[in-house]
């Protein structure tokens, strides 16, 4: 795996490969696309934490990690740095939450519970999937809605949680940030946006005369739009500004002064129909884990005409097929899945665990002030040959029948009102 210390290289490579897969579908159907690599990565990493054998190997390959320890370190770094909330100091609001719901008749293995709570900061809760699947689904959706500030009201659709559901693993991310240099609303004008098929549509374009971070490359140009973060004076350096956050200072030391905090990067192909080729180039790059970092603008430039459209994009899909196309097949195969690291006594209960469905939902809105976005990923896991121990206590009146199985002939029938009475 190609990765640099301190960077989320595995996640970046995963993001670009997944972007290609989802973009192929989006372009063919002429639909916009938004998804959260961070949310999907966290949810799939939760699956990997309980996977073994080929199931684990395929997940690690997809997520760009050499081992579970390597994966946990990558997730830890992402949570502590990439998803750090700086709203208290005037920066972007970022929240990330993970949850593990398991059927109340299943006990999580101590090692899995520890990993979920420790590395992934996940809440673990028992649910009554067998007897109250609809109620359990509503509770999980309510948790997601709260975690995403109501931008994702539902991640689990009707029927996705049922009597055979054993576990549901969920991630939810919320982001809201203001631009470091907001676009004046008075400068927003209507203009033509040219679609891939050659047609055009009138859209509101945000505009600015401020110097911007712009980088020029072979076949495409990159615009960096930083989000506002609180700054403080560096008294040892004559008044230069640095971030007032220990986490972003760590990034400052690693990357250098300009690449600090959170930013949106817009990759604009030179050709109007060049987006598919650009996405292919990103995904196929031999250094895909560092592609975004290597093409970040490093200095501000004077601009003449800067126009960026306002937009709001959403996405909701079950993505089993996409993940299988990227090499993760064993986890979905009842005959091959090995998720034996998740729950106690699974083998003794008549079958193993298998991933049933993976749902992903995301929404982003970009306007003159900044960006608001949210995403959620849910993995439903069922127990094969589900067989729960059921109580049968005949401590009240009952009927009985003696039946010949093949013919169905009833040899005897009756009922018992009082076992102590012979009732002759």
Curated annotation (Swiss-Prot):
CC terms in the record's Gene Ontology section: extracellular space
Gene Ontology terms for molecular function: serine-type endopeptidase inhibitor activity
Pfam families: Serpin
SMART domains: SERPIN
Gene3D superfamilies: Alpha-1-antitrypsin, domain 1, Antithrombin, subunit I, domain 2
Swiss-Prot/TrEMBL site (Reactive bond) positions: 384-385
InterPro entries per the UniProt record, alphabetical: Serpin_dom, Serpin_fam, Serpin_sf, Serpin_sf_1, Serpin_sf_2
Alphabetized UniProt keyword annotations: Protease inhibitor, Serine protease inhibitor
Region of interest (RCL), ranges: 370-394
SUPFAM superfamilies recorded: Serpins
Family: Belongs to the serpin family.
Comment on protein domains: The reactive center loop (RCL) extends out from the body of the protein and directs binding to the target protease. The protease cleaves the serpin at the reactive site within the RCL, establishing a covalent linkage between the carboxyl group of the serpin reactive site and the serine hydroxyl of the protease. The resulting inactive serpin-protease complex is highly stable.
Role, per record: Probable serine protease inhibitor.
Protein name: Serpin-Z2A
Origin organism lineage: Eukaryota, Viridiplantae, Streptophyta, Embryophyta, Tracheophyta
């Amino acid at each position: 795996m190609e990765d640099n210390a301190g960077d989320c290289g595995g996640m970046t490579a995963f993001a670009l490969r997944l972007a290609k897969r989802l973009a192929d579908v989006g372009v063919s159907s002429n639909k916009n696309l938004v998804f959260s690599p961070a949310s999907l990565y966290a949810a799939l990493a939760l699956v990997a934490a309980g996977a073994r054998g080929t199931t684990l190997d395929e997940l690690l390959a997809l997520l760009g990690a050499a081992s579970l320890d390597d994966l946990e370190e990558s997730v830890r770094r992402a949570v502590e740095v990439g998803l750090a909330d700086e709203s208290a100091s005037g920066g972007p609001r970022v929240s990330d939450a993970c949850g593990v719901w398991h059927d109340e008749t299943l006990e999580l293995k101590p090692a899995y519970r520890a990993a979920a709570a420790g590395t992934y900061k996940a809440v673990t809760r028992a649910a009554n999937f067998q007897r109250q699947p609809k109620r359990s689904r509503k509770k999980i959706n309510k948790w997601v809605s709260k975690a995403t500030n109501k931008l994702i009201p539902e991640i689990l659709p009707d029927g996705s949680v049922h009597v055979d559901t054993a576990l549901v693993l969920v991630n939810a991310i919320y982001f809201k940030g203001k631009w470091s240099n907001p676009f004046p609303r008075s400068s927003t004008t209507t203009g033509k946006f040219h679609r891939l098929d050659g047609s055009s549509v009138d859209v509101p374009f945000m505009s600015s005369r401020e110097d911007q971070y712009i980088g020029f490359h072979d076949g495409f140009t990159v615009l960096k739009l930083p989000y506002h973060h609180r700054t403080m004076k560096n008294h040892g350096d004559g008044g230069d500004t640095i971030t007032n956050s220990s986490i972003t200072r760590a990034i400052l030391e690693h990357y250098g002064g300009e690449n600090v905090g959170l930013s949106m990067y817009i990759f604009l192909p030179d050709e109007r129909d060049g987006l598919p080729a650009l996405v292919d180039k990103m995904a196929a790059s031999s250094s895909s884990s560092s592609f975004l970092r290597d093409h970040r603008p490093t200095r501000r430039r004077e601009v003449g005409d800067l126009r960026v459209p306002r937009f709001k994009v959403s996405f909701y899909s079950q993505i089993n097929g996409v993940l299988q196309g990227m090499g993760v097949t064993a986890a979905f195969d009842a005959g091959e899945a090995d998720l034996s690291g998740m729950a106690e006594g699974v083998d003794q209960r008549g079958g193993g665990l298998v991933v049933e469905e993976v749902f992903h939902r995301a929404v982003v809105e970009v306007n003159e002030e900044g960006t608001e976005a949210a995403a959620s990923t849910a993995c439903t896991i069922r127990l094969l040959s589900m067989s729960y121990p059921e109580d049968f206590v005949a401590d009240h009146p009952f009927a009985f029948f003696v039946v010949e199985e093949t013919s169905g002939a009833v040899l005897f029938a009756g009922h018992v009102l009082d076992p102590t009475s012979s009732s002759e």
